[in-house]
Design a protein with these regions (language model features):
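Partner-binding and oligomerization surfaces adjacent to conserved cores of proteins
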Residues: 1-276
Length: 276
């Protein structure tokens, strides 16, 4: 098990070659929701590789609106390829988060990631492979109609985003998300290769895989069980849930000894009202 890296925020800022966007400081912990199969794939691999996804793989048209925009009118700017890791800054909206990310029957895990360890690993990769890194807080200020019209000079936000356009401004527009999603409290870490050929061997299907220490993961939280009752079907479902949790917990600890693995207690304290 690797040693925990202890470093002050000021030392972190001075040692890292990355720019902050929409924020003035780093946060201690990031939360990442992933399916159990993907978490185990990360942990059980000989080299632990974290996925940074090209926005070309994103589904929301409002998040990709500015991905393939022609910016040549802005001093001939041509956008570079970028790769992004998305995570949340807190777990205050836990119930909504589990519902958003839980798809089908596959178990879901929330990883608590020590930000310092993650950023140091990213910084090392970036320096070795000639990449720029941006640590960005997602900007939720704009409503749907304001994002639709943002590219127009008449928009009150036009100068903020499109004057002196460069890679940093490009990352800023790629950090936009509609106001309706403000509850997500998302952060994004963007990697921008200065020499795309230097990262080719780490690319697959528009995803950039970067080596990271699994010690950066301080806690694994298993998705909550569904609200239960006294029915036989509910008891069977709870037994299946407990068996899945036990199996996945054993696999995590085998790959990451002494890992902290817990069930979410989201619904555990709810009691059924039988009579009013």
């Amino acid at each position: 098990m690797g040693k925990t890296i202890i470093i002050s925020e000021q030392q972190l800022k001075e040692s890292l070659s990355m720019q902050l966007i929409n924020c003035k400081s780093f946060i201690n912990t990031l939360y990442k929701y992933m399916t159990a199969s993907r978490v185990l794939e990360l942990l059980e691999a000989q080299e632990h590789m974290l996925a940074f996804v090209s926005p070309e793989n994103w589904y929301d048209p409002y998040e990709t609106k500015f991905l393939k925009t022609d910016y040549t009118a802005l001093n001939g700017y041509k956008q570079p390829p970028i790769y992004c890791f998305c995570a949340r800054m807190d777990n205050h909206n836990e119930e909504a988060s589990w519902k958003i990310y839980k798809k089908g029957n596959e178990p879901l895990l929330r990883m608590s990631i020590r930000t310092i360890d993650l950023l140091l690993a990213i910084d090392k990769f970036a320096k070795e492979h000639e990449c720029d890194v941006y640590f960005s807080k997602v900007d939720y200020r704009l409503k749907k109609s304001e994002i639709d019209s943002l590219h127009l000079p008449s928009s009150k936000y036009y100068d903020e985003f499109f004057s002196h356009f460069d890679d940093k401004q490009y990352v800023k527009v790629m950090s936009l998300k509609r106001w309706a999603f403000k509850y997500e409290n998302e952060y994004r870490i963007f990697i921008v290769p200065r020499k795309p050929e230097a990262i080719v061997k780490y690319l697959k299907d528009n995803i950039l895989f970067i080596p990271v220490p699994i010690e950066m993961i301080t806690r694994y939280t298993f998705n909550p069980a569904n609200k239960s009752n006294e029915s036989l079907a509910s008891q069977i479902e709870m037994a299946k849930y407990s068996a899945e949790y036990k199996l996945i917990r054993e696999k995590i600890i085998k790959a990451h000894p002494n890992a902290k693995v817990y069930k979410s207690a989201l619904y555990s304290k709810i009691t059924q009202t039988s009579k009013i």
